[in-house]
From Swiss-Prot:
Protein's UniProt keywords contain Membrane: yes
Organism phylogeny: Bacteria, Pseudomonadati, Pseudomonadota, Gammaproteobacteria, Pasteurellales
Topology of the protein relative to the lipid bilayer: Multi-pass membrane protein
Hemolysin-type calcium-binding repeat ranges, renumbered to this chain: 744-761, 762-779, 780-797, 798-815, 826-843, 844-861
Protein name: RTX-III toxin determinant A from serotype 8
Annotated compartments: Secreted; Host cell membrane
Major localisation: secreted
Gene behind this protein: apxIIIA
Length: 1052
């Protein structure tokens, strides 16, 4: 046990000694490092104080004993420095060695000394001898002295420019005085400039190799989690697109003032291997290549320093480097080239149409992509270096200073590259702008307007089938079509990039003529006075000699003029403000003596002004004033206020082709026919075409251009009080909107159409024609001989006094008339209710289960096989002569029976729908009203009277005597002729149905006969095959009160 105790005590003693030694070593190391850092800072400060006076100068320092004759063009460099105003200083070697030792510039040709920024002649001369690419620029000591001097000046002025870029934003004097981080940055920048000049001599990448590596890079990241889409896009970069850059020194000269031209990837003669930044090579696998190269370098440095190079450490370094390589940076490069390719393909068509602006835009993105590609590649390598160094120094005591140094230098390089990119991109944009200027000078035309012209030509080509069909669609011989070429993003982007937004307009309007499906290239003689001036808001087609369509095919911006001014709002920010001097109306002079169609639905009549919480959206309205001619015209209105002077002819105004708001059409104050005031509610869900000011942003590196322009959108108005007011003159017919409209007729003849929506139409006085159309409408004819058509929906038709024609249409409708005139009530489809007046009414329920009530007067009821279960309630006087016409029934196929007080007729034919006709209270006694139908006539003209039926049912038990009470005529042509005469009389008077319209006089015979034949068809008259023969036997009665009408009507 004592032995183990001794061993343990000895081990403990040794551990404590090792700990003391380690602490002692740490303290020594720490103190040494602190002392070294302190001494370096003191030396830097000492040197800095000595060079305050010269810190902003560049001095060429030459040892007095240095023999420059062995150099390559050395004396030309010295002379060039003198010509450029660079001080040439000959010093003793001892003085130079002191500077080298103090600032570590012994191996550099550029450094900081007590004299300022110093070019060391021997090192520079050795550099030129070493790198033939530079020395060949300078040349030997023989040759054209002037040429050599110029080339020498290029080298030294290039170095000056590099320094200016490196030290941009650093006050060198203050940096030297403070001795802080900015001095370190300056020293690192000077060192960097030396390295950059050295890299001129090194091989650079070629475009083709770079393309391949980017594509391979895409393959690698495609399988990485979350980066699949990025990888696939990178693989789509076109090699040919990159290889055909044609990028010359005129474009890349601003990259570090031309000194670092090797970074621009433009040397076609260089090796196909890719060399980036400080010589790190991108292999075919970009990530792997950079990671491997950087990792190997850093691991070697760790090994030399005696630090760990184990597997975990190497993995940490490699993973850190991989993370530092950003796929998004390469994706941005890919996007530039892809956009260039996309625009380039688009440009081909318009180049053939006379506009090459899209090609110029494509060129910009191509060259910008090349610039971005070079800088991105370099920055990627630098990021990998910094990340790897940071990982390698993790956990090491000496790591932090190394990390700060490397990070600072690589950050500085990246900053220089990023700073240099802007002038390069501006140079490209300026070059393209010069091409635009040259074109305008040559052709004397606005370049961007020419772009709109090309877009319009393409529109005509693409839309020819549609445009040429308008003549037929609107039933006119000629079409005058106005289109607006709206703001174009490519044209706007080109104007922004070149800084020429003030020369651009928000679009351009065009007028084209089509006739017989053909585009008229030139204006025909009779259109020689056509006026279309969108700046004044004037359109004139009054001299057209044919029926004409005036149509705004696309939304047309409000009339007026535009002006623009480009101003700078920030260091890199510019805005081109738009000022619109708008007109307050459009004035259209229409065709004088021919019918025309005016489609204004795409006319923009509201220009957005402002928005506020209290007042909502506010607008400037542009009124439409349209003077029509003497023909029959049609006008389709937009959402703004209008003044229509229709002139002579039958003119129709339409509100249903677009969203025109909730209408109130008022003719109650009219002193002449065709005069109406229209108020339209444009709030709520009403969508209007409104003109708005938008902006497009485009960027040239850091420079951002904002261009304002006019555009339009179809949207809700956003103003609860927004209204439009129309004044209509000499308008014969109005078609409402697709909302709930209210029509108030005049004391003259009104023709109203409700269109869609649940509408209220009131004709007031006059012989009116009202159409409910779709929706659940209410139509009131009031006084006059009116025609009311319910259309679709469950409608209510009130004919009022007069001779009225009411047609319910589809839906469950209610039809009602007043007075003692002649009225036609037709239910149509659906379960309808028809109420006659005290006059002579025609009641035709149509399809469905209908209720028909004729009232007083001699009424005419119609029932057919397509009718459903109808109920007739005729509450008339005993002197009335009511008739029921069975339109397509024969008595032989009808069964009659008494059910309570009702007379019931039903069909027994399988082809019929087995509907039941009930004549209510037929048998009711002790009532002052007569509920019987005096005559029932079948399709063949055979007639049964109420008296016949009464006698039959009174003596029903004696069935063999029934035929003695029937009429003696099996068929009688005079019965049908009499029916036709009665129907013609009712229909002719009802709503003036048979009167010819549109100013003609007399009877419209065709319309009248058509209505009569709808009820009494000649096809149903006197067909002898229907009177007996096979299948015409009687049915046995199962009830003493039931009998076939055919047996009752047939006399022996």
């Amino acid at each position: 046990m004592s032995t183990w105790s001794s061993m343990l005590a000895d081990l403990k003693k040794r551990a404590e000694e090792a700990k003391r030694q380690a602490k002692k070593g740490y303290d020594v190391t720490k103190n040494g490092l602190q002392y070294g850092v302190s001494q370096a800072k003191l030396q830097a400060l000492a040197a800095g104080k000595a060079v305050q006076k010269y810190g902003n100068k560049l001095v060429l320092v030459i040892p007095k004993e240095y023999d420059g004759s062995v150099g390559n063009g050395f004396f030309d460099l010295v002379k060039a420095a003198e010509e450029l105003g660079i001080q040439v200083k000959y010093v003793n070697r001892n003085e130079l060695e002191v500077a080298h030792k103090s600032l570590g510039t012994a191996d550099q040709f550029l450094g900081l000394t007590e004299r300022g920024l110093t070019l060391f002649a021997p090192q520079l001369d050795q550099f030129l001898q070493k790198h033939s690419k530079i020395s060949n620029v300078v040349g030997s000591s023989t040759g054209d002295a002037v040429s050599k001097l110029a080339k020498s000046q290029t080298i030294i002025s290039g170095i000056q420019s590099v320094l200016g870029t490196v030290l941009a934003g650093i006050n060198l004097n203050e940096a030297i005085i403070s001795g802080g981080s900015e001095l370190e940055l300056a020293e690192a920048g000077v060192s960097l400039a030396s390295e950059l000049v050295s890299n001129i001599a090194k091989g650079t990448t070629t475009i083709d190799a770079f393309t391949t590596q980017i594509q391979n890079f895409g393959k690698l990241v495609e399988n990485a989690k979350g980066l699949g889409g990025v990888g696939r896009q990178l693989q789509n970069i076109s090699g040919s697109a990159l290889s055909k850059t044609g990028l010359g020194l005129d474009i890349i000269s601003s990259l570090l003032s031309g000194v670092t031209a090797s970074f621009a990837l433009a040397n076609k003669n260089a090796s196909t291997s890719t060399k980036v930044a400080a010589g790190f090579e991108l292999s075919n696998q970009v990530i792997g290549g950079i990671t491997k190269a950087v990792s190997s370098y850093i691991l070697a440095q760790r090994l030399a320093a005696g630090l760990s190079t184990t597997g975990p450490a190497a993995a940490l370094i490699a993973s850190s480097i991989s993370l530092a390589i950003s796929p998004l940076a390469f994706l941005r490069v890919a996007d530039n080239f892809n956009r260039s390719k996309e625009i380039g393909e688009f440009a081909e068509r318009f180049k053939k149409l006379g506009y090459d602006g899209d090609k110029l835009l494509s060129e910009f993105y191509h060259e910008a992509g090349t610039i971005d590609a070079s800088i991105t590649t370099i920055s990627t390598a630098l990021s990998a270096i910094a990340a790897g160094t940071a990982a390698a120094s993790a956990g090491a005591l000496v790591g932090a200073p190394i990390t700060l140094l490397v990070t600072g230098i690589t950050g500085l390089i990246s900053g220089i590259l990023e700073f240099s990119k802007q002038p390069m991109l501006d140079h490209v944009a300026s070059k393209i702008g010069n091409k635009i200027d040259e074109w305008e000078k040559k052709y004397g035309k606005n370049y961007f307007e020419n772009g709109y012209d090309a877009r319009h030509k393409a529109f005509l080509e693409d839309s020819f089938s549609l445009l040429s069909s308008f003549n037929k669609q609107y039933e006119t011989e000629r079409a005058v079509l106005i289109t607006q070429q709206r703001w174009d993003e490519y044209i706007g982007e080109l104007a922004g990039i070149t800084g020429k937004g003030d020369k651009l307009s928000s679009g351009k309007a065009y007028v084209d003529y089509f006739q017989e499906g053909k585009l008229l290239e030139k204006k025909p003689d009779d259109f020689s006075k056509v006026v279309f001036d969108p700046t004044k808001g004037e359109i004139d087609i009054s001299n057209s000699q044919t029926s004409t369509l005036l149509k705004f095919v696309t939304p047309l911006l409000t009339p007026g003029t535009e002006s623009r001014e480009r101003t700078q709002t920030g260091k890199y920010e510019y805005i081109t403000k738009l000022v619109v001097k708008g007109k307050d109306k459009w004035v259209v002079n229409g065709v004088k003596d021919k019918g025309a169609v005016y489609d204004y639905t795409n006319l923009i009549q509201h220009a957005h002004i402002s928005s506020s919480v209290a007042r909502g959206e506010e607008y400037r309205e542009v009124r439409l004033v349209s003077h029509l001619g003497n023909g029959n015209d049609k006008v389709f209105l937009a959402a703004g206020s209008a003044e229509i002077h229709a002139g002579e002819g039958h003119d129709v105004v339409y509100y249903d082709k677009t969203d025109t708001g909730l209408l109130v059409i008022d003719g109650t104050k009219a002193t002449e026919q065709g005069r109406y005031s229209v108020t339209r509610e444009l709030s709520g869900a009403t969508k209007i075409l409104r003109e708005v000011i938008k902006n497009q942003k485009s960027a040239v590196g850091k420079r951002e251009e904002t261009l304002e322009y006019r555009d339009y959108e179809l949207t809700q108005s956003g103003n609860s009080n927004l209204k439009a007011h129309d004044e209509l003159h000499s308008v014969e017919e109005i078609i409402g909107s697709n909302q709930r409209d209210e029509f108030k007729g005049s004391k003259f003849r009104d023709i109203f159409h409700g269109a869609d929506g649940d509408d209220l139409l009131n004709g007031n006085d006059g012989d009116d024609i009202l159409y409910g159309d779709k929706g659940n409408d209410e139509l009131r004819g009031d006084n006059g001989n009116d025609q009311l058509y319910g259309g679709e929906g469950n409608d209510k038709l009130l004919g009022g006094n007069g001779n009225n024609y009411l047609s319910g249409g589809d839906g469950n409708d209610e039809l009602q008339v007043l007075g003692n005139g002649f009225n036609v009530l037709r239910g149509g489809k659906g379960d309808d209710k028809l109420y006659g007046s005290s006059g002579s009414d025609l009641l035709d329920g149509g399809e469905g289960n209908d209720y028909l009530e004729g009232g007083d007067g001699s009424d005419f009821y119609v029932y057919r096989s397509t009718s459903g279960n109808h109920t007739i309630y005729d509450q008339g006087k005993s002197s009335d002569l009511d008739k029921l016409y069975l339109s397509d029934f024969s008595f032989d196929r009808l069964l009659v029976e008494k059910v309570d007080d009702n007379l019931v007729l039903r069909s027994n034919e399988s082809s019929h729908n087995n509907g039941v006709l009930t004549i209510k209270d037929w048998f009711k006694e002790g009532n002052k009203y007569n509920h019987k139908i005096e005559q029932i006539v079948d399709k063949n003209g055979r007639k049964l009277t109420a008296e016949n039926l009464g006698t039959y049912f009174k003596n029903a038990p004696k069935a063999d005597n029934l035929l003695n009470y029937a009429t003696k005529e099996d068929q009688n042509e005079s019965n049908l002729s009499s029916l036709k005469t009665e129907l013609s009389k009712i229909i002719t008077n009802a709503g003036n149905f048979g009167v010819a319209k549109q100013g003609n006089t007399g009877i419209n015979t065709a319309a009248l006969n058509n209505e009569v034949n709808k009820i009494i068809s000649s096809a149903n008259t006197f067909a002898t095959s229907q009177l007996g023969g096979s299948g015409m036997g009687t049915l046995p009665s199962t009830n003493v009160n039931s009998m076939m009408l055919g047996n009752l009507a047939r006399a022996a």
